[in-house]
Amino acid sequence: MKTFTLPASVLFCFLLLIRGLGAAPPGRSDVYPPPLGSEHNGQVAEDAVSRPKDDSVPEVRAARNSEPQDQGELFQGVDPRALAAVLLQALDRPASPPAVPAGSQQGTPEEAAEALLTESVRSQTHSLPASEIQASAVAPPRPQTQDNDPEADDRSEELEALASLLQELRDFSPSNAKRQQETAAAETETRTHTLTRVNLESPGPERVWRASWGEFQARVPERAPLPPSVPSQFQARMSENVPLPETHQFGEGVSSPKTHLGETLTPLSKAYQSLSAPFPKVRRLEGSFLGGSEAGERLLQQGLAQVEAGRRQAEATRQAAAQEERLADLASDLLLQYLLQGGARQRDLGGRGLQETQQERENEREEEAEQERRGGGEDEVGEEDEEAAEAEAEAEEAERARQNALLFAEEEDGEAGAEDKRSQEEAPGHRRKDAEGTEEGGEEDDDDEEMDPQTIDSLIELSTKLHLPADDVVSIIEEVEEKRKRKKNAPPEPVPPPRAAPAPTHVRSPQPPPPAPARDELPDWNEVLPPWDREEDEVFPPGPYHPFPNYIRPRTLQPPASSRRRHFHHALPPARHHPDLEAQARRAQEEADAEERRLQEQEELENYIEHVLLHRP
């Protein structure tokens, strides 16, 4: 077998080297087939994973790759070192082949080598690192036979000679240095600037594809980081379940499944460089689903919250405007109804002017509008609360309308020299009454009966704010003037006499009782030491200052009050004091003063209400 295998292998190796010296390095894209679709990429990845299952037998691989191929384009872009390693493996495989006829021994090694080379070009020639290829070329794997015979030693020597010859031919090539530099740069770029992406729907080796790190940063948004758990899970699955082709072929030469996984997928990454349309869209969608979901949800929630807040604010503004307009219409209706029914019969308001009342009314309206605006943001308000608020608003409007009606009669006495803007529209009866009044009393009442122009202007402005038309304002003014004239010509009303003030009920303090009659005078010599002059009922028990009953008091000790009171009875109050009577008298005096003040305040309030606010005929 050695005689037939070695010359054919050497010639075939020389032929391959001559054809592959001018091939482009594996890093160039012009050698590869036309761009592939996503389906073809997945199929290639699946073939790359499922191939180790049935590549252990050379005959099966030769049967799978028996399609006719062009010899000129078969090994373009193939690294010579990879071809040398494959040839060495092919030389090693026929060491223990099955028994075949002698006539067909010459063609069998060539067909097996060609099948192995074809399969290696498709699956793994680009993925073998240079260091492993060189190591396998320098130190080829041990033969499968366990016999330590001289034939095995001769074959190993021949293999070493063939490896050295291939190395010399490779060094002799003129374009070898350039190809080595480009290959090293391509491998460095592939190993350092690639990132493995995994499809989340079906994580597995058939869905893995590699992309440039620069393109990944340019296309994937910043808020869409890759999930850290997916690569680790994928690597664990690959290390546990899927064996790699390099592991079956080179045995101990492979360092780790992770390294050969990246090297196996290198053709996919190079093929992806020529694809421009499908993959960026998928990556953009995948990036948006990976990291942009949370950001999108946050943005959506913020937008919905802003829309809801704007809607609530618009609804509150609309409700406040509608409530304000409704209250204004209600106030104008109440004012007009009150004026037409004779509310102008009231008299002056005791010094309160029209401008102050109008300003107070505007302030109250602004406060109500502010309160309604604050409460407008609530969506649900009870009907009872609304009815109570409406009733309260109506009561307030009625009270203000009553006060405004009283203002119409404020200028009853008027000021001299004032001219009415509507003096030309007065009735002729009014002029006749003025003439009769002039003949009888010799006094002119035109100025008294006419309203002040400033008052009319203020009334017009107030009615405008109450949403009343100009015709209604004119009719109201005419009604007020006619009622004032009729009331002016009416007989004077009898003024009720003022109520007499109640007589003050002062509680006087009780008079002190008369002094007690003087007792018998004691001799003068008894004034110094009068201890026997004490009264019978005055007994001083021993206390803290009298520890001993027989204590002799000094002469500086003052006599008791009863002893002193005997000699000055005409100027001092009686001997017996009654504190309870004095306290009762003091309390009675305070109660009388409080009652008097209360009556005075009540009388003043009644006088103010009767003569100033609510004076009725």
From Swiss-Prot:
The keyword Nuclease does not apply. This is Neurosecretory protein VGF. The modification Pyrrolidone carboxylic acid is found at residues 180, 313. It comes from the Eukaryota. Induction: By nerve growth factor. GO terms for molecular function: growth factor activity; hormone activity; neuropeptide hormone activity. Residues 148-157, 378-397, 437-452 have a biased composition (Acidic residues).
